[in-house]
């Protein structure tokens, strides 16, 4: 080989390990998803579809019976680097990647190669291969989601009765437990798992229905037979392509799952602030948080996840835009999907794995949680006092006004809500000391076990 040919060979080998569309940056590829969207795997799936079609056509007497075996023999040990080079060269001439692909396979196969792609249109191959890849991608996403569920469940059960102040609008509300907080994220992740399974079913449809979807060349029976061989479903009614609402469902599901990860990441970020200090994501001994400030411990993984979730929402919109193609199809979807499908699946895969690592290594500061709760007194018990007054016969509006006054005084003067209530003439007259103390004696975690039971019992 000349020096230039050697460089081209090395470039092609590198390209085979990169995504077919070269969209996702290397920084966020994980090996499993990178391999799935590699150019080599894309070409392998195209070959797989072509061979499955040839087998079915031979079985139904459409092409000679010996053709599939001859094709399989010709493609044994197929050099995908050479196939990619051939495709690249011919695509410059044809300006059509599938036409170039079929022409290259025909060269490899020799005389039996004339039966390749018999009765097919390009997207019979592309969409059916996409279904194979997307089905496997969804399987990887489900597996990662289940790993996150396991980590969340373990951490939630560990902290079932670890008290933490609940906050609404960013302001102290009433106590809850860290376990219940994490259990909520577990339940949301479980729902995202179910949505991913539904989306996996939705995208597991291929088509061999020809140029406008009427199956007039090969027939619906052959389409069904090939899909059974590939472990897919035949699209009930297609055009030249599988309807894009299927892809839109997947991209929307991915965006929803990403938003769930973003919500968890945001919670960790907020509780990791210096003035809160209740938890922190893992931080390695040799890790550095700033080029200028050695003391910094930034929640960079959670921040990264939040940024990626924004990308996923954009891809969900792309999926919706791709639904309305012209008549029996145009090609406006193609360029968008070459980016959106590998990027979105790969990003969610990365985000989910990283969040699992964060949850497993989450640093919990229970002492700081307790300190934060006690630092500002017990005015958060105001609802208990309100309910006691209502039970004693006071109108809700009047009772609310009294307790608001007592709570404000407790905050302003730094005294307990009980002392403030006993110093409030109307409250003290209605409840007296024993009634106030009894009203404020409350276990905020009394129903934690029941909530855990109803969430986890089905699992």
Regions found by a protein language model. Name each.
Residues 20-209, 215, 220-225, 234, ...:
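A helix-coil-helix interface module used to build multimeric assemblies
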Residues 71-75, 241, 272, 283, ...:
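A general structural motif at alpha-helix termini
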Residues 223-316:
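Acidic, glycine-rich loop-and-beta core segments that form the ion-binding/anion-interacting portion
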Residues 5-9:
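Acidic, Ala/Val/Gly-enriched low-complexity intrinsically disordered segments
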Residues 144, 170, 174-184, 188, ...:
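Short, contiguous, pocket-lining structural segments
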Residues 53-56, 141, 145-148, 152-155, ...:
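Amphipathic alpha-helices that form helix-helix packing interfaces
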Residues 23-41, 84-85, 91-93, 100, ...:
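Catalytic-core signal marking the mid-to-C-terminal active-site face
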């Amino acid at each position: 080989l000349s020096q230039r040919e050697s460089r081209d060979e090395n470039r092609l080998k590198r390209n085979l390990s990169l995504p077919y569309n070269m969209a996702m940056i290397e920084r966020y590829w994980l090996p499993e998803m990178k391999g799935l969207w590699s150019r080599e795997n894309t070409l392998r799936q195209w070959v797989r579809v072509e061979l499955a079609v040839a087998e079915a056509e031979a079985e139904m007497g459409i092409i000679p019976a010996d053709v599939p075996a001859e094709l399989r023999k010709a493609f044994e040990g197929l050099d995908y680097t050479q196939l990619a080079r051939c495709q690249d060269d011919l695509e410059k001439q044809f300006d059509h990647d599938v036409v170039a692909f079929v022409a290259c396979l025909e060269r490899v196969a020799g005389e039996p190669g004339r039966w390749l792609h018999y009765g097919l249109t390009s997207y019979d191959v592309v969409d059916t291969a996409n279904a194979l890849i997307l089905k496997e991608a969804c399987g990887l996403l489900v597996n990662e989601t289940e790993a996150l569920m396991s980590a969340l469940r373990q951490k939630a059960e560990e902290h079932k009765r670890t008290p933490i102040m609940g906050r609404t609008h960013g302001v102290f509300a009433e106590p809850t437990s860290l376990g219940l907080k994490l259990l909520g994220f577990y339940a949301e992740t479980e729902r995202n798992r179910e949505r991913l399974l539904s989306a996996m079913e939705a995208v597991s449809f291929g088509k061999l229905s020809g140029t406008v979807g009427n199956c007039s060349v090969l027939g619906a029976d052959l389409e069904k037979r090939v899909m059974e061989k590939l472990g897919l479903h035949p699209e009930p009614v297609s055009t030249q392509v599988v309807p894009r609402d299927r892809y839109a469902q997947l991209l929307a599901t991915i965006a929803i799952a990403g938003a769930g990860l973003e919500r968890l990441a945001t919670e960790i970020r907020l509780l990791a602030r210096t003035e809160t200090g209740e938890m922190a994501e893992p931080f390695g001994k040799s890790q550095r948080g700033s080029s200028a400030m050695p003391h910094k411990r930034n929640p960079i993984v959670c921040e990264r996840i939040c940024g990626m979730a924004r990308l996923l929402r954009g891809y969900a919109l792309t999926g919706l835009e791709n639904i309305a193609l012209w008549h029996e199809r145009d090609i406006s979807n193609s360029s968008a999907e070459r980016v959106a499908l590998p990027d979105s699946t790969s990003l969610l895969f990365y985000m989910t794995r990283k969040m699992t690592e964060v949850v497993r290594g989450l640093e919990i500061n229970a002492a700081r949680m307790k300190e934060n709760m006690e630092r500002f007194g017990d005015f958060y018990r105001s609802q208990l006092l309100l309910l006691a007054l209502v039970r004693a016969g006071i109108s809700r509006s009047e009772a609310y006004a009294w307790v608001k006054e007592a709570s404000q005084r407790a905050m302003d003067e730094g005294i307990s809500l009980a002392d403030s209530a006993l110093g409030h003439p109307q409250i003290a007259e209605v409840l007296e000391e024993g009634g106030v103390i009894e009203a404020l004696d409350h276990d905020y975690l009394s129903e934690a076990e029941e909530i855990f039971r109803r969430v986890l019992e089905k699992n």
